[in-house]
From Swiss-Prot:
It comes from Staphylococcus haemolyticus (strain JCSC1435). This is TelA-like protein SH1505. It comes from the Bacteria. InterPro entries: Toxic_anion-R_TelA (IPR008863). Belongs to the TelA family. It holds the Pfam family TelA.
Length: 389
């Protein structure tokens, strides 16, 4: 496994671990003394004097042929590792970063909900400018901006809460990383102590037992040699188990750092959003609204100027017309000649018609008188004729 300085602190055993993570030790009880001395020399090169003293003390916990003691050797470290792994699992399960991403996505959606270009008629489509008055557009965008700003403020509170939780998680992971490192250091010492004790048994105890068995030829002495060799084999397996636990610690370190890096990146993203993106958005919206109000003020001023000019032009035209009409009327007499001619003609015609009517009336009365006289004579004659009869 390649080293990653970001996740692993420097340790005297790092190079040794990388080269011999799962060291398959020779189970042969007749390993040469030269090879065993090489192992001890490697230990002395990898560990400090203080650590070598600890290794010496720990190695004394291993009693030859004490199988129960060997079974419990380093077990408390593995139990702590089990508790540590359980704690890591709880941390991963209970800390869901999904809501953080959801809040950031909501923030980006809200920031895009209001576009400052909507306040600029020149950047709007012709169809939109045709169907939508600028005033209405400004009011609509301003109202939408206020609503979005309130929603952004609420999202900001959520993001700030997420950032605080992420910061707490980062500190907690720092503690977990230190626990993992302490476990890594301790299990290294126990592995080294077990190897040292194995070396002592192989170089001292077994040769003595073999020599004694060779001298006596006693079957029980020979069995004692076999028991000691089996104990070394169990010790080898115990070392292997501890090496596996150490490998878990090695793999856990970068995993913790990766989780921390993700949390740190999210916290920085939230910080950037709260301190940069949101204020920048508000500033840009404020600038856009201010520029639009200035544009409207200029348009209003232009409209007032145009209206004033139109009024002046219209008033001048009306004044000109009134002056001409007044002067024309002033030059006219009280009664026009044409009016007098028409009136006189009408009067003469009326008199002539009146005289004609009077003449016709006299003529008709004379004719009526004649008819009345005739009727009267006719009536007298009729009466006389009736008397004669």
């Amino acid at each position: 496994m390649p080293r990653n300085d970001q996740f692993n602190n420097s340790h005297p055993l790092d190079d040794y671990i990388e080269q011999q993570q799962l060291n398959n030790l020779d189970n042969n009880s007749n390993v040469s003394l030269a090879n065993q001395n090489t192992v001890l020399d490697d230990f002395q090169q990898q560990f400090s004097d203080k650590e070598m003293q600890k290794i010496e003390s720990i190695s004394q916990q291993i009693k030859p042929l004490d199988n129960d003691g060997l079974l419990s050797y380093g077990s408390h470290l593995q139990e702590n590792m089990s508790k540590f792994s359980h704690k890591m699992l709880d941390e991963v399960q209970t800390k869901d970063i999904g809501p953080v991403g959801d809040s950031l996505n909501q923030l980006m959606t809200k920031l895009k909900a209001v576009n400052p270009d909507e306040l600029n008629p020149e950047k709007q489509s012709k169809l939109k400018r045709f169907f939508k008055r600028t005033k209405a557009s400004i009011n609509e965008v301003f109202s939408r901006m206020q609503s979005v700003s309130s929603q952004i403020d609420r999202i900001t509170i959520q993001l700030d809460r997420h950032k605080n939780n992420l910061s707490k998680d980062i500190k907690l992971l720092d503690g977990l990383y230190q626990q993992n490192k302490d476990y890594f250091d301790d299990v290294n010492l126990y592995i080294a102590a077990a190897k040292r004790r194995k070396h002592e048994i192989q170089t001292n105890d077994i040769p003595k037992l073999q020599e004694h068995a060779n001298q006596t030829g006693n079957q029980m002495d020979i069995q004692a040699v076999a028991d000691m060799e089996q104990f070394v084999d169990r010790l080898d397996k115990r070392i292997y188990d501890l090496q596996l636990s150490r490998q878990i610690a090695i793999q856990t370190a970068p995993q913790i750092r990766m989780i921390q890096n993700v949390n740190q990146a999210l916290a920085e993203k939230i910080q950037s959003s709260i301190l940069t993106s949101i204020p920048l958005w508000k500033n840009q919206m404020a600038i856009a609204l201010t520029l639009m109000r200035q544009r409207n003020a200029v348009s209003a001023q232009r409209a007032v100027t145009d209206t004033t000019n139109d009024l002046l032009t219209q008033n001048a035209a009306m004044l000109k017309q009134n002056a001409i009409e007044t002067a024309t009327e002033n030059e006219r007499g009280i009664v026009d000649i044409e009016t007098l001619k028409t009136t006189q003609s009408d009067i003469i015609e009326t008199i002539e018609q009146t005289l004609q009517i009077q003449q016709n009336g006299r003529q008709k009365r004379k004719e009526a008188e004649k008819e009345l006289v005739g009727l009267e004579d006719e009536l007298k004659q009729h009466l006389l004729s009736m008397k004669k009869e």
